[in-house]
Amino acid sequence: VCSPIITINVFAKYHMPRILTQFRKTYPRIEIHMKSGFSHDRYRDFLEGKYHICIVRGEHNWNEEKRLLWQDPLCAFSKDSLNMDLLPSYPYIHYMTDPLFQNVLDDWWYAHYKKPPFTIIETDAMDTCLKMVQEGLGFTLLSRSCGQDTPHIHPTVLTTVEGKPLLRETWMFYRHNYHLLTSVKAFVDFMKEKY
């Protein structure tokens, strides 16, 4: 029996290895097929019916079953501590992410600053972005979990204008009839126990 799942890269890297190991011990006869990538691409694949379970970040217009799995604070990462009031004057290393997340970052930025970021580098590779930060070339804006494998960088949690941490939510989406497929029901129930 097979259960196709799609997930975002960050969740695939930091959570899915442990989840899949535990799931396979509990359900050794259920085979999992997983694909990872950007939230907007994976969500589109899910809507097209290619996958039974979708783990994505951010706000999506999903009206069937969903479960909040995780909240990750958004941070400004830099080699040295930052004065957040002066952020527009620091060199910015822009990680070209999915459009939904970029909108969140843009909304946060322009709620706090009148000037655009002083962008010096743009990259679509998160590891490249973090290496540039690690070398002291500038700062970047990412979820806190993205920097956990990069030593010697400092995260500063972004806050709303009300002073609350800015969080990025990770959701598991599945359809109302998920219980009709044994493998999908097993995985959804397993995730409900863990999260």
Regions found by a protein language model. Name each.
Residues 5, 34, 53-55, 76, ...:
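Generic preference for hydrophobic
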Residues 38-39, 114-159:
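Hydrophobic hinge/microswitch elements
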Residues 91-114, 180-181, 188:
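Secondary-structure junction motif
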Residues 1-61, 122-123:
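Central regulatory/effector-binding core of bacterial HTH transcription factors
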Residues 37-90, 145-146:
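Acidic, Gly/Pro-rich loop/turn segments at junctions of secondary structure
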Residues 15, 157-195:
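A late-sequence structural motif
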Residues 67-68, 75-77, 139, 169-173:
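Residues embedded in well-ordered beta-strands
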Residues 62, 80-87, 100, 163-166, ...:
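Short helix-loop capping/hinge motifs at secondary-structure junctions, enriched
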